[in-house]
A protein has these predicted regions:
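Generic structural signal for well-ordered alpha-helices
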Residues: 138-139, 173-176, 311
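Conserved inter-motif catalytic segment of the P-loop NTP-binding fold
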Residues: 53, 83-171
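Conserved catalytic network of the ASCE P-loop NTPase/AAA+ motor domain
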Residues: 42, 81-84, 143-145, 178-183, ...
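C-terminal regions of RecA-like/P-loop NTPase motor modules
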Residues: 3-12, 26, 144-147, 221-331
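Short, solvent-exposed loop/turn segments at secondary-structure junctions
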Residues: 43, 159-163, 193-200
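The Walker A/P-loop phosphate-binding site
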Residues: 2-108
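Phosphate-binding/switch region of NTP-binding enzymes
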Residues: 49-50, 60, 90, 170-254
Length: 331
C-alpha cells in the first residue's frame, strides 16, 4: 500500500505565496459560462443557486438551462457556453425516482430539440445514496473527467444531513468552494425555499446566499398559469429581466413580462423564529449599526430599506440593545 505520510503539505509561507495577488494575471473572459439575458450569472470556480418553493418550476428552468449547452442559441434567454477544450457537463440528480429522472432527461432533449444527447453529457441518479457517498462520487467523477467544466447538483439539501447545523453548513460551503477552485468548474445547484418566509432553507440557505455567485428566484403563479424566474442576488452583474413562462397544453413558452414586477418584501413578514435565528447569527459580537445593516443585506440579499426595517424590529423587540460604546449586541 502506498505510504501517504510522505505527501508534502504546504507551509503557511508557501500558502501565502500561492494565494498572493498576481498583478500580471488577467482573468480569462472565457471563464464566464452561464449568461441569462446577457448578464453574467455563472463563471468557473463558482457555484450558483436555482431556488424556489417545491413544485415551483425549478426543474423546467434548470432543464432548459442544461439544454442550452447543446445548441448554438439561448433558450429562454439562458445560455451555457462551455470552454472549447472542456466541453463536458454532468448532472447528479439526488431527488428523482426512475420515472421522474428519465422524464427529466427527455425534457432536456425536447428543450434542445435533439433525439439523443451528446456523449459529453453525463448524468447520474443517486437518490438512494447517502450524503458522504454522493460527495465522494462527485469528487471521483471530477478526478476522472478533467474536461468537465459544469457540474449540476440537484439538489443541495441531499449533500448535508442537518441543514440547520452551523458547522455542517459551513463545511458544505467550504467543500463547494474548494472543488470549484481545484477542478475549475461552475456548479449549478438547486435549493428549496421555506414556505413560511420565502427564504432559502435553513442555515445552509444563509450560507449559500452569502457565498454563491448568483441566487435565482423561481415562483409559480397558479392564477395566471405561469412561472417566473428572477435574480434574487447577482454578485458579478446587474439583474436580468425576469423570465416568464406560460404552460400551453403542456408546452412551456416564454411570454412578455412587462407587467411582472418582483414584489418588494417587508421585514415584518419574516417569521419570528427565523428573525431570531438570523439575529443570533449576525450579531455574534458587539457591532456598529451600519455593520449590522450591511450584514443583513449580505445574508438576505435584500435591500437597504429591508435591512433597516429588520434592525428596527430587532431593537423594538429587545433582541439587540446598544452598549456603552455605542455598539449593538444580543440582549
Amino acid at each position: 500500500m502506498e505510504n501517504i505520510t510522505n505527501i508534502h503539505k504546504p507551509t503557511i509561507d508557501e500558502l501565502l505565496e500561492l494565494r498572493k495577488y498576481k498583478p500580471d494575471y488577467i482573468p480569462n473572459k472565457d471563464n464566464v459560462i452561464l449568461r441569462i439575458g446577457g448578464k453574467v450569472v455563472g463563471a468557473s470556480m463558482n457555484y450558483i443557486i436555482f431556488g424556489g418553493l417545491p413544485k415551483a418550476g425549478k426543474s423546467s428552468y434548470l432543464n432548459s438551462c442544461i439544454a442550452s449547452a447543446f445548441v448554438p442559441y439561448d433558450i429562454f434567454t439562458m445560455k451555457i457556453n462551455l470552454p472549447e477544450n472542456r466541453r463536458k457537463i454532468c448532472l447528479f440528480d439526488t431527488e428523482s425516482s426512475d420515472y421522474d429522472y428519465y422524464n427529466r432527461i427527455e425534457s432536456i432533449k425536447r428543450f434542445a430539440e435533439l433525439e439523443n444527447l451528446p456523449n459529453w453529457f453525463n448524468s447520474f441518479q443517486v437518490r438512494e445514496d447517502g450524503t458522504g457517498t454522493i460527495r465522494r462520487m462527485v469528487e471521483r467523477y471530477l478526478e476522472l473527467n478533467p474536461d468537465c467544466s459544469v457540474l449540476v447538483l440537484d439538489g443541495l439539501l441531499d449533500l448535508i444531513i442537518n441543514y440547520n447545523d452551523e458547522k455542517e453548513s459551513s463545511m458544505l460551503t467550504k467543500w463547494l468552494k474548494k472543488i470549484t477552485k481545484v477542478h475549475d468548474i461552475l456548479i449549478i445547484s438547486v435549493l428549496h425555499f421555506n414556505k413560511s418566509n420565502d427564504h432559502t432553507t435553513g442555515v445552509i440557505g444563509s450560507h449559500s446566499d452569502r457565498f454563491a455567485q448568483s441566487t435565482l428566484d423561481i415562483k409559480k403563479d397558479k392564477d395566471n398559469n405561469t412561472y417566473v424566474m428572477s435574480s434574487r442576488f447577482m454578485r458579478s452583474d446587474s439583474d436580468f429581466e425576469p423570465i416568464t413562462l406560460m404552460n400551453f397544453s403542456g408546452n412551456l413558452q416564454q411570454v412578455a413580462n412587462d407587467s411582472v414586477k418582483p414584489k418588494s418584501k417587508k421585514a415584518s413578514d419574516l417569521d419570528l423564529i427565523e428573525s431570531q435565528r438570523l439575529c443570533k447569527q449576525i450579531v455574534s459580537m458587539p457591532m456598529q449599526y451600519s455593520e449590522i445593516v450591511d450584514e443583513i443585506k449580505e445574508r438576505t440579499a435584500e435591500s437597504n430599506t429591508y435591512a433597516k426595517q429588520l434592525m428596527k424590529i430587532w431593537i423594538s423587540k429587545g433582541m439587540v440593545s446598544k452598549d456603552h460604546t455605542g455598539k449593538y449586541k444580543i440582549f
